């Protein structure tokens, strides 16, 4: 009987995850726990990092059976077949006010200038030995747009998706720490004190026409990005139409929350020890930081150029909001500007380049897809 008990226990042990647990699994479970701590205790993008971290822990449980058909395979399908990022964009569009951009269209140039971080990171990644597809997926981290980063990574470098997503969302949460030193380094105190004129009112007609025209023009120019831009602008049309409140509310709340859970958990599920624990992950994290700093620099420098051209009417600080971390980057512009001049209220001015950055990052992704093309699946 004792021998039968020993045999039974040995069988239980052999079937358990403990018997197949590797040092890599243990390290990645610890990474997941650290990310959970950062999200819950420190408030770093908790709505995104929490499910990513939990997905990371689940992915590193040996013999989890996730390769079998079931809910996890459905979630992974949504990640690898680019289902979730466009749905996230639908919710983002429903929550976005393009009024500041419509009122001051030249801020679209600031959103474009901030995309320099994407291409700086792309060239850096290629110099470090990444393929052009991998470098493109890494470069989009500089746009500070998690869904776009996941969308492009799934198409161009699915094996790097976990590292790219974690880098993108981690640095988005660190925008208040990364941007101010760059902003102060490349602006003078006099420039930071500039008070901008109040924006003009934007009519309902303009707000309704804007998403329709954006969809048509950008999609015709860059067909590969139609899914992202189309869903972003459809969500915004729900918001601005005035007769689609139920759809707008669903996109902003129920749908957005549901898809966020699926997208973030699925991203975490890609963070297996085999895929994550390599030198490429370290390079991606370093390149992501360079991309964020370069994007901030590009926006600020172009803001300085605009300031010189318009006779000192533009505060260069709003250029840093050209990265699409909405609305964190715009808030940072407001905080830095108000420290220099308590009478400064840059938030609405900064929202122009901030929402332009959302469009700019999607356009950058579409450009790379059109020029380079996705990897074969």
Regions found by a protein language model. Give the residues of each.
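Transmembrane helical segments that form the transport core of multi-pass membrane transport proteins
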Residues: 215-302
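Juxtamembrane and boundary regions of transmembrane helices in multi-pass small-molecule transporters
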Residues: 123-132, 164-192, 298-311, 356-377
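Alpha-helical transmembrane segments
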Residues: 159-177, 285-295, 318-321
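N-terminal alpha-helical transmembrane segments of multi-pass membrane transport
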Residues: 1-70
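Interfacial helix-loop-helix linkers and transmembrane-helix boundary segments
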Residues: 40-49, 67-75, 95-110, 244-253, ...
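Membrane-embedded hairpin module used as a gating/binding unit in multi-pass transport
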Residues: 167-243
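Alpha-helical membrane segments and immediately flanking helix-loop junctions
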Residues: 77, 81-82, 89-95, 110-120, ...
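Entry/N-cap segments of selected transmembrane alpha helices
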Residues: 33, 101-122, 272-299, 350-354
